[in-house]
Amino acid sequence: MQLERILTETNIERSKFKQYKVLSKYINAVAKKYTLNNVSNKYGKVLFIKDGVVKVSGLSQIKIGEKVEFVGKNLFGMALNLEATSVGIVIFGEDTAIYEGVIVKRCEQNFAIKVDKTMLGRVVDVLGQPIDGLGELKDTKTTRVMSVERKAPGIVTRKSVHESMLTGVKMVDALLPIGRGQRELIIGDRQTGKSAIAVDAILNQQVNKDIVCIYVAVGQKKSTVRRLVEMLNTKGALEYTIVVVSTASDAAPLQFLAPYTGCTIGEYFRDEGKHALIVYDDLSKHAVAYRQMSLLLRRPPGREAYPGDVFYIHSRLLERAAKLNEKYGCGSLTAFPIVETQAGDVSAYIPTNIISITDGQIFLEKELFNKGIRPAVNVGLSVSRVGSAAQSAVMKKLAGALKLELAQYRELARFEQFSSNADAVTTQILKKGKLTIELLKQVNNNPMAVGMEALMIFAMSTSYFQNLDLSLVRAEEAKLLQYIHSVSSFKLYAACVDAVKAFNPKDTVFTEMCQSYVK
């Protein structure tokens, strides 16, 4: 149309129009053939580098999130900013070897890692390489190369959560049931026992070992990670666990990539029809790492200086946790993201984002922790949106009454400090509430089998513990558990109680257990 307008304006004869049109097409074809974009767009050159971020020219057709290699430096990076004349790239490693003029090569793919069953019992870095000194990981027939950025399972591939994911923590399994394929946020201030609940859940899978556990340490101290690995090894849980580590001394891009690497490993087992549990410890540090990268890339800051897409980096990660249906192997990936709050403020930007993404949250309070209530779970602010759909028949029956009793206790406990003239009913509710809280206390790294959990909840709902002094409750609980373990028939029943399809709260075996112990 432009050529026709020019011809009309210059009064060129109509008969010569076709000749000019053919000539124009030829010139355009030659120009397109020799344009700089098509001569070479696979290599670029570093223009400048600062604080782990480089500007590169020449990579005109690179895609966002694409992996690049710094030629001859044994370093990789990822393209995050696509600008008119340059590309903003973050470096995965130390930037001391990078300088102006270094050649950058496109890898024409996103970051990918090799995943296999041989990773079980190992400690790996963000790139999937072992860092535990136990030798290299060898490829096998089942080894798969998987991109760390993968699409979440679609709607038709999913199935509703209905299988229980037992944590071994009485308070969680009874009041906040978690299912396989669920995303349950663990949130609270620093030093309130967030990681302890997640680690207990890993230790509790030792009973049947049908769940592969992945622990992702984001921005943690090396000494903390070492203690965790040693504890898992001592308890015999490391053999079914994979630890993905990006410590506080690692560059921000490595801390940013760590959860996606761990999720990819979990998806490998989920797609094989197995069940996996992944712990992200913690996503607050993950968000801070992404904020650091974004500010260095000169992206516009938003609320609390986080970039506008900080919600998306967490939603696309957590949506990958799912329960698949029969057509896709019935596998599941359960996620326990951990978020740290400041002075109990759950209305901050990152906590509210992740609360809106997940299927419930376990809220831990500093005040409860300081009172000696461990785990320091605030049952009123905590919720599991899956509910009793993922609970066994036994726990469903027993926990229903427990929730009501605790709700009544919380309501009356507020007024207890203002008035000492309570009636007999109120006094009884307060006494039973204190007893229940005492029995729900549990030490770290000591998960309890579901049968024993059910027995203790049954015992606290009857008169066996009612007349005990609160200071003696924990000791009496230990004696009862020891007695059940010593009687083979009781121990066998407790071991298979989770499989019971129908349960009567006045079950004769549970009653017999308690009566036999009292005698």
From Swiss-Prot:
Q: What's the main place this protein lives?
A: mitochondrion
Q: Which cysteines are joined by disulfide bonds?
A: none
Where is the site described as Required for activity found in this chain? S382
Q: Which family does it belong to?
A: Belongs to the ATPase alpha/beta chains family.
Q: How does it assemble?
A: F-type ATPases have 2 components, CF(1) - the catalytic core - and CF(0) - the membrane proton channel. CF(1) has five subunits: alpha(3), beta(3), gamma(1), delta(1), epsilon(1). CF(0) has three main subunits: a, b and c.
Q: Which PANTHER family match?
A: ATP SYNTHASE SUBUNIT ALPHA, MITOCHONDRIAL
Query: Per its database record, what is this protein's job?
Result: Mitochondrial membrane ATP synthase (F(1)F(0) ATP synthase or Complex V) produces ATP from ADP in the presence of a proton gradient across the membrane which is generated by electron transport complexes of the respiratory chain. F-type ATPases consist of two structural domains, F(1) - containing the extramembraneous catalytic core, and F(0) - containing the membrane proton channel, linked together by a central stalk and a peripheral stalk. During catalysis, ATP synthesis in the catalytic domain of F(1) is coupled via a rotary mechanism of the central stalk subunits to proton translocation.
Its name, as the record gives it, is ATP synthase subunit alpha, mitochondrial
| Species | Dictyostelium citrinum
Recorded name of the encoding gene = atp1
